[in-house]
């Protein structure tokens, strides 16, 4: 934009000079004034752009898109392409499994990131015989596309391309506890058909609140027979184990060329360069880490990350993502049980030279680094991992057990659900429980999924804390059905991060900020109703700080109501002193706290909402209030929403169905916002 402004202001006086003889002296004067005003305006606007007054999240330039995925498919003899919209890696994993399946049917597949290609090329796909495009699309947050599928989503909304002749199928990944279950998968499936593409198999809807793996397997085992029937092909054999990567051990590697945990650019942690994002996180120093609650049953914590000199900007309601590290004790045990030297420098290189994904994680590196920073070793492995590992079990009964759990039989699915998923058995536990299962460590590293960033609602306002990001979290620790004690990867890791001490050592956290739609109203006079039990209070600490700051600036601020819930006042009442101070100062108009275990009958936030229903209705209907809900999606968010249905129905007054529509319209208008998790 800046270049175009400079070009315009430079050429305009010349154009005026050519025509000036056609006008009177008065006209010339007027033109001179106009030119002067325009020139000044352009220069002034240019200066304002160089120093924006609004906060904007820094993002990297979009990746360079390859010229044509269709041409690449032709060149490499592929006829199936599986695009994935993935935020946590699961959709990408499913896409890889589908593309790998293709060889069983005499077809060749490839998985692809839609961010790397121009999807307008879809119209050329019918040029390839028996071609098929599959989309594994996750839904993020409240019905949004994942980051890497945003451009594809925008293109689908705007395009009118004719996709006649394109054959497609869609598998969506979602969670039924969310309002917009599988919105992205449903939209892609519907929109492709509207553009003329032909669906060859029904839309699959995976539910992460249930058993996503089983949903995918059930869809997949019906999908391939449908593909065979449509294209007139037959399966060429049973599912087989085919290595995707080959191991290369580096005997004399320069350590300066070895990855030590970086997510993108080699040595990026030693030489930090903005902008910072998922592929280039900022190493933030921990400046505060304190326990928020009393007692020993749980550990709720408040952390502060220093973002000085990072140029990172955030708004109240945004999310901070952190890249955690696995427990070194677990990593060492895996190395010991497999008899592996974890400090060997190695690379896993893709056997498919045409693939964009050259390595499963940054290489060259060591097994120790891979298992610590790059691979997920604490979540239950998926069935395809068990299938691949089974070949390394020397005891027939153990091999049979693994094969059964990886099968699509009803008995196998039940066994996998109970023994792996519900028992929360991670890879180390499986290796411990199967003494004869000893896979090569390089193949295990190939099979394990990537360790993903963890997202937290930011618990601060940049107006008050421009150089720090605050996190409120609970350390996850529980006894699994297997009898083992499992701990949350990120929260256990964060809990151990001590602020800089006298010795000058700094605890660092790789992080970046992700923009959110969870925003305070544009007008400060708009009332806000905040509902957030437990750590759901996090974004509201930022909201309240910002409303208090606005008051200090002399701005008129509307009513600010908080409905907070915890167990007991003397146990887990988070930010008690801060909230009391905000209430006393008037920044927080109402502080309503529900204690669920302090009396004989349990009191939850929805009970307090019901108590105040008449005032809440006035704020919503007459005051244009915005409602914000943060916390548990499975129970709390639904109960709160049902309470608002009841309030609207009572004071509308209107039928329940009309009340539901009323609240849904509030959501559409951005007046009822959710920041929830399951």
Swiss-Prot record:
FMN binds at residues 86-91, 138-141, 173-182, 208. One of its GO terms (biological process) is response to dexamethasone. The keyword Endoplasmic reticulum applies. GO terms for cellular component: cytosol; endoplasmic reticulum membrane; intracellular membrane-bounded organelle. FAD binds at residues 424, 454-457, 472-474, 478, 488-491, 677. The keyword Acetylation applies. InterPro entries: CysJ-like_FAD-binding, FAD-bd_FR_type, Flavdoxin-like, Flavodoxin/NO_synth, Flavoprot_Pyr_Nucl_cyt_Rdtase, Flavoprotein-like_sf, FNR_nucleotide-bd, NADPH_Cyt_P450_Rdtase_alpha. It holds the Pfam family FAD_binding_1. Residues 44-678 are cytoplasmic. The chain crosses the membrane at residues 23-43. The modification N-acetylglycine is found at residue 2. GO terms for molecular function: cytochrome-b5 reductase activity, acting on NAD(P)H; electron transfer activity; enzyme binding; flavin adenine dinucleotide binding; FMN binding; hydrolase activity; iron-cytochrome-c reductase activity; NADP binding. Its EC number is 1.6.2.4. Its cofactor is FAD; FMN. Binds 1 FAD per monomer. Binds 1 FMN per monomer. HAMAP family: NCPR. This is NADPH--cytochrome P450 reductase. It comes from Rattus norvegicus (Rat).
